Amino acid sequence: MCIRDSYKDAPLYIPPYEYYNKEISAWAKSMGIQVVNFTPGTASNADYTTPDMKNYRSSKSIYDQIMALEKKEGLNGHLMLIHFGTHDDRTDKFYNGYMEKMIKTLKRKGYTFTPLREAVGFW
């Protein structure tokens, strides 16, 4: 079996640390994989940080940033990266409360949530 054939069920790729360049993009394309990344501005990707880090963002500050951005320019089409596995030192896991609050708030505002494959047109 060719490696390329095994990617049919996972055609989307978020590179480690969300870092990629032309070489990574070309590699992915040659394998039939689409590189995707989060939309900057919401700070949702900072949910991995721990209190000892210089760039630490609490779950409340992440939630507040998302809501502030929504109020300022809307979130239609935004891709948010939320980590479902974070270090034990991060005791305020975004997914243990603020994620549900965010989803409910955005649904009340008329937003819908779309599977990633559909959102990026990769069905």
Q: Over which residues does each language-model region extend?
A:
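Catalytic domains of cell-wall/extracellular-matrix polysaccharide-remodeling enzymes
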Residues: 4-81, 85-107, 111-112, 117-121
